[in-house]
A protein has these predicted regions:
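Extracellular loop-to-transmembrane helix junctions
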Residues: 1-19, 72-102, 111, 330, ...
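Membrane-interface loop-to-helix entry segments
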Residues: 9-27, 129, 145-149, 165-212, ...
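Membrane-interface "cap" regions at the ends of multi-pass membrane proteins
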Residues: 10-66, 268
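Helix-loop-helix module between adjacent transmembrane segments
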Residues: 10-11, 15, 56, 90-106, ...
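Hydrophobic, membrane-embedded alpha-helices of multi-pass small-molecule transporters
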Residues: 48-64, 207-215, 224-287, 332-344
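Loop-to-transmembrane helix boundary motifs in multi-pass membrane proteins
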Residues: 123-127, 162-170, 275-284, 292, ...
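Hydrophobic alpha-helical segments and their helix-loop junctions in multi-pass secondary transporters
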Residues: 138-156, 163-168, 180, 199-226, ...
Length: 506
């Protein structure tokens, strides 16, 4: 319990102390923001600060800090450390700079930001990468909720069309089209803050349930410092990839520009971007604590949690909420596992539209231009989603790559932020250090993950268990990170000699 409370205090303190350092390093001023300067009534709309925070939280969170934290809890309370320090020194820094760099560049999408600071080749790579990732996320977050709604209807004894995934998938996709097409203040600005509040209430309810029920005890880090993973999966770098949104997520960089286009003042960035990520870290910490405390531990392994997750992550959420909050928890769980993915899905499609708009220089005040982009984006999503609902397309293999690509995107954004700070003659180490760390994480996982190169490097025991080739992957991952850092330092040294290099950024 004390480990949890200490980490919670560090997260809250990190917002004020380290978040203040990050804000001071960036240096927000009183310049006119894109929302005030452009104000097209569609994507550039001034919103109140509390709505900015809640929408940003819901956009970046969804079920990420719940699913990722529960999976991360398989390693035991050691996951508390990554959630805490990863959020403070990496995730919140990443979210703040991805949002504020966008704000300084007229609300540009992250692919355009990467192009400005990392070069034209990286811009084109990020454009394609971002659109594919966003459409994939949006599609999966349409299929998932549709399936959950069908489960509810079937459990209630309903049959016919309302008990088919295809029916609800079409309804979700129609909603996605509307939310992607219309002004951000019409649906997202009105409803999403309420869902954000529900996400926070659900986390608070789980925390209260854990502390008030004597049968649940949160284990201490110092008593369980080693890995408790039932499958023996290494902490490095699997835990860092698995927790994903609960500590740092590249997907957030695709969402932050949405709110960067709605801020009235640059000084709102600390609360909206850094603060929302810290809040997500707190939510992840609570759910990780739930995973560590509510289930049976056998022989130092989280066998009970593993069994619960084997029934499906949504079922695990339902179980945690019902155990800690009873009937109210069940209602919140249903809202969470259905509404939260939908809210992440539609903003994913909206972000895809904006990435394409920036790519092809199409202003979005015109409804015709929005329609031109919405139709193909949602069309591809519909084809993939309906194909999945009909059993023609399997996302399982594709989705395995999401966690790795997610953290790799975060790595790229942090390197872009480092270049930004170099051009601005600021302390670039504040982003270069987490960029180097995430480079090591991403490369190591790419070598160890069975869906990546691990299928060639790892071996199997007689009973089918994976033996990870850490002797090869660990040193290569570290060396690769050092090489990336060396390339960065060489690049800034070279550019430092160029005349007026500081004018290359805004």
């Amino acid at each position: 319990m004390f480990s949890f409370l200490i980490c919670l205090a560090l997260l809250i303190g990190g917002y004020f102390v380290y978040g203040g350092i990050v804000e001071k390093t960036f240096g927000p001023d009183d310049r006119e923001t894109p929302a005030v300067k452009i104000n097209d009534g569609v994507d550039y709309v001034v919103l109140p600060q509390w709505k900015l925070f809640m929408i940003q939280l819901l956009n970046i969170a969804g079920l990420g800090p719940i699913f990722g934290a529960l999976q991360g809890a398989l390693w035991g309370p050691i996951v508390f450390l990554w959630i805490t320090f990863g959020t403070i020194f990496a995730g919140a820094v990443h979210d703040y700079f991805s949002g504020m760099m966008s704000e300084r560049n007229e609300g540009a999408s992250i692919s355009e930001i990467a192009g400005i600071y990392l070069g034209g080749a990286m811009k084109n790579v990020m454009r394609v990468f971002s659109v594919v990732l966003l459409v994939m996320v949006g599609t999966v977050f349409a299929v998932g909720p549709a399936g959950l709604i069908v489960t509810l209807f079937k459990n209630g004894g309903h049959e016919g069309i309302v008990a088919t995934t295809l029916f609800w998938l079409i309804i979700v996709l129609v909603y996605y089209f509307i939310a992607t097409f219309i002004s951000i203040d019409k649906i997202i600005g009105k409803i999403y803050p309420l869902f954000g509040i529900c996400l926070i209430i659900m986390a608070i309810g789980v925390a209260v349930g854990i502390f008030t029920k004597p049968e649940y005890t949160i284990p201490e880090i110092w008593n369980n410092f080693g890995s408790m993973h039932p499958s023996g999966t290494p902490v490095w770098s699997f835990m860092f990839i698995t927790v994903a949104c609960g500590a740092i997520s590249g997907f957030h960089a695709t969402q932050s520009p949405l709110m960067a286009r709605c801020m009235k003042s640059e000084k709102q960035g600390h609360f909206v971007f850094y603060g929302a990520m810290v809040c997500e870290g707190v939510i992840a910490l609570i759910w990780a604590a739930a995973g560590c405390s509510l289930y049976e531990v056998t022989g130092g392994l989280n066998t009970g949690l593993a069994a619960a997750l084997a029934n499906g992550q949504s079922a695990a959420i339902y179980d945690v909420c019902s155990k800690t909050m009873g009937g109210v928890g069940i209602a919140l769980a249903m809202l969470g596992v259905i509404a939260c993915p939908i809210t992440s899905g539609d903003t994913a499609f909206r972000s895809a539209r904006l990435v394409l708009a920036d790519w092809f220089h199409m202003e979005q005040k015109s409804w015709k231009n929005r329609l031109i982009l919405c139709v193909p984006v949602l069309g591809v999503g519909a084809i993939l989603g309906i194909g999945n609902a009909l059993g023609k397309i399997d996302y399982t293999i594709i989705w395995r790559y999401f966690s790795w690509t997610n953290q790799t995107l975060a790595m790229i954004v942090l390197w872009a932020a480092s270049m930004y700070l170099f051009y601005d003659k600021k302390n670039y180490w504040i982003t270069a250090v987490p960029a180097t760390f995430m480079s090591a994480v991403s490369v190591t996982y790419f070598l160890l993950g069975n869906e990546c190169l691990g299928q060639f490097l790892n071996t199997k025991t007689a009973d089918g268990a994976t033996v990870y080739n850490t002797a090869v992957a660990y040193p290569i991952g570290i060396i690769a990170a050092i090489v990336f850092l060396g390339i960065f330092l060489y690049t800034i040294k070279k550019r430092h000699t160029e005349p007026h290099y500081e004018t290359l950024h805004k």
